Amino acid sequence: ETGIVKGSVDGPKEIDGYLKKNEKTNQVTVLKANELCREDKDALPIRTQYRPLCSDGRHTLLEVKLITGRSHQIRAHLASIGHPIAGDYKYGDPAVNREARDKYAVQSQMLHAWRLVMPKELREPLAGLGGREFTAKPPEEFMRMAAGMPGYERFIS
């Protein structure tokens, strides 16, 4: 996945934590990895890898890889380390979202699954998809925002 986040991001890095979901609000909280979380059956372990691709100093285009796959994981995990996804109205920064909307006409979160690689060994009925790769171009609003970052075209087009 690729995402456009707030700030200049150092990396690459791997981050860990625990995710706890509030069913009433459909929102998750990221907790630091500690003994208390390990004992809480509702706190699920999460691990996310990311690598900055390019930046304009105010925003960074990241490549993100889920090691665990939890609902809202990328959005909440990046927000918890101070780099929320632009256009994310649930976990994002209101000022960043406002700028993305006003300057780049962003209407949704700047998170894009550009490539999906299927595992080689799959059972029926998906066996025929084993080893295949699927790609999708980013939406126009994603491209508009990314275009402000020097070198973005090396990573997305």
Language-model segments: what does each one mean?
Residues 1-157:
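RNA pseudouridine synthases
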